[in-house]
Amino acid sequence: MEDFVRQCFNPMIVELAEKTMKEYGEDLKIETNKFAAICTHLEVCFMYSDFHFINEQGESIIVELGDPNALLKHRFEIIEGRDRTMAWTVVNSICNTTGAEKPKFLPDLYDYKENRFIEIGVTRREVHIYYLEKANKIKSEKTHIHIFSFTGEEMATKADYTLDEESRARIKTRLFTIRQEMASRGLWDSFRQSERGEETIEERFEITGTMRKLADQSLPPNFSSLENFRAYVDGFEPNGYIEGKLSQMSKEVNARIEPFLKTTPRPLRLPNGPPCSQRSKFLLMDALKLSIEDPSHEGEGIPLYDAIKCMRTFFGWKEPNVVKPHEKGINPNYLLSWKQVLAELQDIENEEKIPKTKNMKKTSQLKWALGENMAPEKVDFDDCKDVGDLKQYDSDKPELRSLASWIQNEFNKACELTDSSWIELDEIGEDVAPIEHIASMRRNYFTSEVSHCRATEYIMKGVYINTALLNASCAAMDDFQLIPMISKCRTKEGRRKTNLYGFIIKGRSHLRNDTDVVNFVSMEFSLTDPRLEPHKWEKYCVLEIGDMLIRSAIGQVSRPMFLYVRTNGTSKIKMKWGMEMRRCLLQSLQQIESMIEAESSVKEKDMTKEFFENKSETWPIGESPKGVEESSIGKVCRTLLAKSVFNSLYASPQLEGFSAESRKLLLIVQALRDNLEPGTFDLGGLYEAIEECLINDPWVLLNASWFNSFLTHALS
């Protein structure tokens, strides 16, 4: 750091900083961060004053170097950088000639135009925190405070920034450059952290000896002693300060800070109404697969060939009939659509060579199901400007729905293990550095915990369906293309397996914009009888299409096989994100890594191996009405993965809003649990913002009910 300071700053500034440190008895070889901070502060003070002059008319003007008017009076008197005696002499002289009130502490500059002393601050923390500390130390309304940060933020008394924007921009740019230069040499983190104040010490026990010295060294800047700092913290009155700041913003704004106590928060109000329904793009726990092991047929890997091969494994087809109609749809059309798929697949099999893709005939039932010619005709705006009552359609408010138990069951199922592996261990080259070795060890442990997880199956299924649908939407825009819903996995014995879940038929797809919608009809196999939870299947028409022999504890039993049919839609941007669902694996791995890091820093060694191999240890996985649920590390991995996958499958504006707003309340509650005595204003407004997102989305409603469980246990 010392070398960097000597290279980065003007020699005059470096010399002044050395003198200052000597005067205060500090060793610049040891206190290198302080050395850098003093140089930075000096440079900002000089830049603040540079080029600013006062002309004969008493107006402030900016004059660049080398200008013939260099005899003009300087606008600012620089006090910072002088030795203490000289500095006080200058301050006294200014007070005598201008009648200014003498400050208690040495300021940095005097402004002859505004007739006030200026305290300049340069902080590595948040500007308002540093501003508060300065204001509290000076306790004088006469001295103007101006704080700059290394991130380009600034704060000044009464938002009066003294200088023009260009001059301030020069200072901010210089600070940003210093930060980048430090970062490129690996010095920034240490420099940034060296300014941090320690947390307040609550107990009033006497601190002596080494601990006392450490306490005094650990104080935030501008505090000479622990008592001084304690007095500041105890006497800090947020209401006055925050109200003052708000009153600068607007006369209408006011905010009383209310203490947030255990009794303050209430549970979130979940909506009443009919139970919520399934809205994912494909079936989850209710899906049924027709599978082939060790596929080696001709054209293996071509979706249509694979699908036909899977269909041939089932012999229990029967005349289909509707067992659960769609309330608002024309159900015979859904029935005819399935019959058409069967017939056209049969036609393909009768051909000599199976084609690689199949476009369905544009029958009336498919046109209806895919909304063909249903969109209102678009009219050019110029042609209807004169229409008097031109207005947008009135759209009904969404109907409120209540939480139903099926979504918790879906989540539980997603956390479970299946008997197949859905992802391969990445074949990655030799580790070069030790950190890579740790990273790949963690990845391998994590992969082995989640490779058989049902949530991982949903990822691979989602990636496949979205990729196939986006490809078809671009390659066959006008066609009703038949797209098999396929996934691939490995059995316990390591044999490859190809699975067919059903089919999608894509509608017209001239997708110009990211949000343009392509309609599709999905037809998915299932053994779930829809009559058990009809509310879950509100958007579906369900057919009974066959009987399947299932191996059970009492031998083979015959179960009816259903087909869940619905009209759905998606867009380019949704398909793009669907194709990237593998990111969920990365997100949950990072969450697990941060748990390992926390454990490792406590034990001061890498705890990866112990973390995954100590089977007796349990970890918190979430809240339920019973309290905090704990489980093995594998279950934690799978639960985190399932949450990430459901955030992707059930992505919606309601979820975005709920996540952002409930997080604020969560942080306040956590602050209360950590005894940080949080205060809030407009808590009612925050509740309103959260509850505005609780409308009808099953995943959001489930998260809200989990949040209520968390509130109950966090505050009991």
Curated annotation (Swiss-Prot):
It is found in: Host cytoplasm; Host nucleus. A motif (Nuclear localization signal 2 (NLS2)) lies at residues 184-247. Keywords: Cap snatching, Endonuclease, Eukaryotic host gene expression shutoff by virus, Eukaryotic host transcription shutoff by virus, Host cytoplasm, Host gene expression shutoff by virus, Host nucleus, Host-virus interaction, Hydrolase, Inhibition of host RNA polymerase II by virus, Manganese, Metal-binding, Nuclease, Phosphoprotein. InterPro entries: INFV_PA, PA/PA-X, PA/PA-X_sf. Transmembrane segments: none annotated. It is an enzyme of class 3 (hydrolase). Phosphorylated on serines and threonines by host kinases, including human casein kinase II. Pfam families: Flu_PA. The keyword DNA-binding does not apply. Its main location: host cell. Its cofactor is Mn(2+). It comes from the Viruses. A motif (Nuclear localization signal 1 (NLS1)) lies at residues 124-139. One of its GO terms (cellular component) is host cell nucleus. Its EC number is 3.1.-.-. Mn(2+) 1 binds at residues 41, 108, 119-120. Binds 2 manganese ions per subunit. Gene3D superfamilies: Influenza RNA-dependent RNA polymerase subunit PA, endonuclease domain. GO terms for molecular function: endonuclease activity; metal ion binding; RNA binding. Plays an essential role in viral RNA transcription and replication by forming the heterotrimeric polymerase complex together with PB1 and PB2 subunits. The complex transcribes viral mRNAs by using a unique mechanism called cap-snatching. It consists in the hijacking and cleavage of host capped pre-mRNAs. These short capped RNAs are then used as primers for viral mRNAs. The PB2 subunit is responsible for the binding of the 5' cap of cellular pre-mRNAs which are subsequently cleaved after 10-13 nucleotides by the PA subunit that carries the endonuclease activity. Influenza RNA polymerase is composed of three subunits: PB1, PB2 and PA. Interacts (via C-terminus) with PB1 (via N-terminus). Belongs to the influenza viruses PA family. This is Polymerase acidic protein. It comes from Influenza A virus (strain A/Russia:St.Petersburg/8/2006 H1N1). The gene is PA.
